[in-house]
């Protein structure tokens, strides 16, 4: 059954995608994108426990958006942390000083508007230059690499591609207690899904 107002929402989200991409292509690379200290500060700021509320919108479909809540914990990992060594090996990098820092993220998610089994998981990632190395992707257990940039001290953008799909993500802090996230999933140049998150620090 169609969700009231869904088509209007999809149109608005598509416009926001176009505006975001236009702004990104027309503006010069922000100097923050090459600053290791700024990247480390962003990861340190992310550390802690978060309550996440999110929606998944399937584009070009009358399907109602999926809704979920998650309990998330982010642990900051300094460069010498032992958790980063297996990640370096998985990506065929030298384990010694492979990353400037990283993080371990654990989560437990529950869908609120459909009957599905709760999901639990964890992932480890590290950053080096303008690349983010992860032990798994959004929809794969294989190690993946994302490109990232900081367009402001509180805003990070990432691009990831694997298995014929691409993922554009933006993470933005709103003050000290909240952050927003948006992920756009595309295949063959066609946007398929938008995931939007509001996360509150506990």
Swiss-Prot record:
GO MF terms held by the record: lyase activity
Pfam families: CpeS (PF09367)
Protein name as catalogued: Putative chromophore lyase CpcV
Keywords: Lyase
Leader sequence residues: none
Superkingdom field: Bacteria
Coiled-coil zones: none
Classification via InterPro entries: Calycin, CpcS/CpeS
Organism (species): Picosynechococcus sp. (strain ATCC 27264 / PCC 7002 / PR-6) (Agmenellum quadruplicatum)
HAMAP family: Chrphore_lyase_CpxS
Family as reported in the entry's similarity comment: Belongs to the CpcS/CpeS biliprotein lyase family.
Function text: Covalently attaches a chromophore to Cys residue(s) of phycobiliproteins.
Phenotype upon loss of function: No visible phenotype; a triple cpcS/cpcU/cpcV deletion mutant has decreased amounts of allophycocyanin beta subunit (ApcB) compared to a double cpcS/cpcU deletion mutant. The lyase activity is therefore unsure.
């Amino acid at each position: 059954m169609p969700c009231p107002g869904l088509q209007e929402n999809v149109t608005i989200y598509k416009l926001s995608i176009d505006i975001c991409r236009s702004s990104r292509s027309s503006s010069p690379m922000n100097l923050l994108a090459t600053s290791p200290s700024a990247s480390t500060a962003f990861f340190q700021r992310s550390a802690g426990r978060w309550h996440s509320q999110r929606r998944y919108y399937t584009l070009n479909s009358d399907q109602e958006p999926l809704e979920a809540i998650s309990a998330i914990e982010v642990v900051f990992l300094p460069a010498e942390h032992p958790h980063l060594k297996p990640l370096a090996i998985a990506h065929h990098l030298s384990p010694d000083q492979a990353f400037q820092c990283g993080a371990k993220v654990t989560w437990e998610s529950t869908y609120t508007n459909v009957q599905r089994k709760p999901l639990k998981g964890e992932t480890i990632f590290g950053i080096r230059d303008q690349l983010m190395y992860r032990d798994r992707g959004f929809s794969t257990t294989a190690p993946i690499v994302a490109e990232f940039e900081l367009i402001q001290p509180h805003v990070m953008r990432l691009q990831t591609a694997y298995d014929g799909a691409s993922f554009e993500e933006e993470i933005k802090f709103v003050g000290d207690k909240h952050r927003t996230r948006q992920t756009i999933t595309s295949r063959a140049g066609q946007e398929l899904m938008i995931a939007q998150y509001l996360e509150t620090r506990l």
